């Protein structure tokens, strides 16, 4: 495991090809670039989470080797592979777009995955999460009404097997944040502030963190 790199540069610099290439080459994966060819009102475009944000999440200590992470809308697999590599956790990516899923499967062959990463081609709203999953990551992969259905599946899993479970929401839209903060099953924790990593003062540059109540 390499020493975590601290990124304190603006947004344009953070997504420069040189910065992307450093991590892409180290991990042996290809995940860069935005793709909105299959986006619609239900599913948002593919845009990988910046590596500097993932570094900050890994540095938080909230995800450890003992954890099993689900990345909803995993795209080409960056989040799953990076966090498994840096924290030692097991990671499972859920993706509905077969083309992106196939690219993730190719990336999963990287030694960085070390048999701790897997990807599933599935509709997140219908997917039954494994009972060992205890962390979930979201980067606005789908519309709010779909998120509600996904949360329902997470709650169902907790009813089958009560356990601590933490949710991470990067760059949340205002309506999503309001919904989450008002939800009776969610306990808000200290968010991970990422505004200093980018140009300007974008209030959405953060990772919201919630603990899920097993029962009301």
Language model features by range: what are they?
Residues 114-122:
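Conserved SAM-binding strand-loop segment of SAM-dependent methyltransferases
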Residues 90-95:
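Conserved SAM-binding motif I beta-strand of class I
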Residues 104-105:
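Conserved SAM-binding loop
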Residues 66-75:
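Conserved class I S-adenosyl-L-methionine
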Residues 135-147:
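A short SAM/SAH-binding and catalytic strip from SAM-dependent methyltransferases
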Residues 77-81:
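Glycine-rich SAM-binding Motif I of class I
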């Amino acid at each position: 495991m390499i020493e975590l790199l601290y990124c304190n540069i603006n947004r344009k610099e953070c997504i420069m090809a040189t910065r992307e290439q450093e991590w892409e080459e180290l991990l042996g994966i290809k995940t860069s670039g935005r793709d909105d060819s299959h986006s619609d009102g239900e599913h948002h475009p593919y845009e990988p989470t910046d590596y500097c944000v993932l570094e900050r999440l890994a540095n938080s200590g909230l995800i450890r080797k003992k954890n099993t992470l689900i990345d909803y809308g995993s795209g080409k697999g960056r989040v799953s592979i990076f966090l498994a590599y840096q924290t030692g956790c097991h990671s499972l990516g859920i993706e509905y777009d077969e083309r992106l899923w196939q690219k993730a499967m190719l990336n999963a062959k990287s030694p960085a995955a070390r048999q701790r990463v897997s990807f599933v081609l599935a509709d997140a709203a219908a997917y039954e999460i494994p009972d060992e999953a205890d962390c979930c990551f979201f980067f606005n992969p789908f519309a709010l009404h779909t998120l509600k259905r996904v949360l329902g599946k997470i709650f169902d899993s907790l009813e089958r097997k009560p356990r601590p479970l933490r949710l991470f929401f990067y760059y949340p839209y205002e309506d999503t944040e309001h919904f989450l903060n008002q939800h009776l099953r969610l306990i808000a924790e200290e968010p991970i502030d990422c505004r200093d990593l980018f140009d300007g003062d974008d209030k959405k540059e953060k990772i919201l963190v919630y603990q899920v109540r097993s029962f009301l």
